[in-house]
C-alpha cells in the first residue's frame, strides 16, 4: 500500500501540470545528451564500430567488429575510467558479444565527450591489437 502522503503529492503534481512540464524539460535534456554522445562517437570511434541513433530512451548501442568481445574489453575500459554494459547479457539466446550499451542520461555533456574519447582510444588500441592477433602479425 502506497503511503497516503505520497499519493497526495503525486495527485497534486499531476493536477497542476508539473509532471508535464518536467517530462518536457527532461526530454530536452536527454536529447541534448544523446546528441553530444552521437557527435563524440563520430569523432572518436575507430573504423568498424557502428552505433544506433535512438529516437527515445536513455541508451544507445555500440557494435564492435565481430572478433571483439565487449565483456573481455570491460577491464580495459574501467582501467581507462569509463564503463558500459556488455551487450551479451541482453541477448538471452546468445550473441551480442561484440555489443555494448551506453547510457547518456546521467553524465553531463562534458563527461559524455570525455568518456567517449577515452572509450574510443581504448577501443582503437584493443582493436588494433586484436587485428594483429587475427592476422598472425
Q: What do these predicted ranges mean?
A:
Residues 1-137:
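PLP-dependent class I/II
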Amino acid at each position: 500500500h502506497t503511503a497516503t502522503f505520497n499519493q497526495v503529492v503525486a495527485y497534486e503534481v499531476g493536477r497542476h501540470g508539473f509532471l508535464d512540464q518536467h517530462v518536457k524539460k527532461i526530454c530536452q535534456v536527454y536529447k541534448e545528451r544523446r546528441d553530444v554522445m552521437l557527435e563524440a562517437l563520430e569523432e572518436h570511434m575507430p573504423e568498424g564500430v557502428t552505433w544506433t541513433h535512438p529516437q527515445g530512451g536513455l541508451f544507445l548501442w555500440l557494435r564492435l567488429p565481430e572478433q571483439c568481445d565487449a565483456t573481455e574489453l570491460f577491464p580495459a575500459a574501467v582501467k581507462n575510467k569509463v564503463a558500459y554494459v556488455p551487450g551479451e547479457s541482453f541477448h538471452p539466446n546468445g550473441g551480442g558479444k561484440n555489443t555494448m550499451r551506453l547510457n547518456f542520461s546521467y553524465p553531463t555533456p562534458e563527461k559524455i565527450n570525455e568518456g567517449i574519447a577515452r572509450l574510443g582510444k581504448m577501443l582503437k588500441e584493443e582493436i588494433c591489437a586484436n587485428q594483429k592477433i587475427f592476422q598472425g602479425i
